[in-house]
C-alpha cells in the first residue's frame, strides 16, 4: 500500500500518476479476443470446449457436462448451509422489492385528432448473465443481475461462470437456482461471451449480455455489441474514499478492501484530512487484508 502526504515534494505528480486514466485498448488483447470469438462462431461447441479445457483446465469431454438446469441446478440448494440460504433469500427479497418499483407500465392516450399514441413495454425473451469465477466467486452478482430480469418478465435467463479445474462453487449455483436462473453453463472468458452472442449447438443466442468479468470478458462484450445488447463495459474496480474524521476507520478499510480484492488491477484510493484517520486506517487495512488472503490464497501474491 502506498502512503504519501500533501507536504511531500512530488505529491501532485504522484496523485496524478495514481489516478491517471488507463491506457488505450491493448492491441494484443483485442486480437486475441477477436480470434476466440471467430473460433466459437465457426466451430461452436467444439471450440467452446477446447477453450474451456485450455484456459480453465476443465476435464469435461462434452459441453453437456458443463450445463446445469432443472433438478440438477436445484440440487445445489441442499449443498449450502441454513445460514447461507437465509442470507441469499433475504438479499433476493430486498433486491426484488426494489426493482418492482421500477416496473414501467404500458400506457396510451388519444389526442385531439383521434390518434392513439402510447408505449408498450415488452421484456426481452432471453438474457445472458456472466458471473466471475476466477479469483473469487460472487453470488451477489447472480442475484443483482438475475432478479431485475425476472421482475421485468424475461422468460429465459442463462448464466455462464468459469469453474477452474471443474470446481463448482455450490453457493453461486444455489444462488442461481434461488434467483430463478433457467440454465447455468460453467464456461467463462471471451469464449463464453461469444457463445451467448452467437449461439452454439448447445447454447442458444441471447438478446442481451450483462454482468462483470475480467478484461477479456469486457473486450468480448465490446466486440459483440451490436449483435447483442450489453449493459456496459466494466473496467477494473475503482473506489475513492474521503476520510474526514466523521467515519469509523474500520469501515473505510473495509470499503477499500471490498474493491481491491476484485483483482490485481483494482484501484483503491483514500484521501484523509487528518493524520489520525489515515494512521488508523493504515493499521486496519493489513488486518483485513490478512483475512482476505485466508479466504483467497491466490490473492496474497498480487496484493501484498
Question: Model-derived features: where do they sit?
Answer:
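A glycine- and small/hydrophobic-rich beta-loop-beta segment
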Residues: 262, 270-283
Amino acid at each position: 500500500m502506498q502512503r504519501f502526504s500533501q507536504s511531500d515534494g512530488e505529491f501532485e505528480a504522484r496523485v496524478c500518476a495514481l489516478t491517471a486514466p488507463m491506457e488505450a485498448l491493448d492491441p494484443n488483447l483485442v486480437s486475441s479476443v477477436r480470434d476466440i470469438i471467430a473460433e466459437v462462431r465457426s466451430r461452436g461447441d467444439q471450440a467452446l470446449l477446447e477453450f474451456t479445457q485450455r484456459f480453465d483446465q476443465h476435464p469435461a469431454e462434452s459441453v453437456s457436462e458443463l450445463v446445469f438446469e432443472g433438478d440438477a441446478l436445484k440440487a445445489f440448494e441442499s449443498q449450502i448451509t441454513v445460514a447461507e440460504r437465509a442470507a441469499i433469500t433475504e438479499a433476493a427479497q430486498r433486491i426484488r422489492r426494489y426493482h418492482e418499483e421500477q416496473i414501467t407500465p404500458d400506457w396510451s392516450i388519444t389526442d385531439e385528432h383521434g390518434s392513439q399514441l402510447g408505449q408498450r413495454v415488452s421484456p426481452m425473451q432471453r438474457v445472458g448473465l456472466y458471473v466471475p469465477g476466477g479469483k473469487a466467486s460472487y453470488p451477489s452478482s447472480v442475484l443483482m443481475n438475475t432478479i431485475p430480469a425476472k421482475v421485468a418478465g424475461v422468460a429465459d435467463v442463462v448464466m455462464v461462470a468459469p469453474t477452474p479445474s471443474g470446481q463448482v462453487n455450490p453457493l453461486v449455483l444455489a444462488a442461481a437456482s434461488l434467483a430463478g436462473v433457467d440454465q447455468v453453463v460453467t464456461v467463462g472468458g471471451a469464449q463464453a461471451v461469444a457463445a451467448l452472442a452467437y449461439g452454439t449447438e448447445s447454447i442458444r443466442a441471447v438478446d442481451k449480455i450483462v454482468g462483470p468479468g475480467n478484461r477479456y470478458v469486457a473486450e468480448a462484450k465490446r466486440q459483440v455489441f451490436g449483435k447483442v445488447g450489453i449493459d456496459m463495459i466494466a473496467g477494473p474496480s475503482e473506489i475513492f474514499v474521503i476520510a474526514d474524521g466523521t467515519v469509523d476507520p474500520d469501515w473505510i478499510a473495509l470499503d477499500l478492501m471490498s474493491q481491491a480484492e476484485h483483482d490485481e488491477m483494482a484501484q483503491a484510493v483514500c484521501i484523509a484530512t487528518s493524520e489520525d484517520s489515515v494512521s488508523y486506517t493504515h493499521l486496519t487495512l493489513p488486518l483485513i487484508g490478512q483475512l482476505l488472503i485466508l479466504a483467497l490464497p491466490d490473492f496474497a501474491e498480487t496484493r501484498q
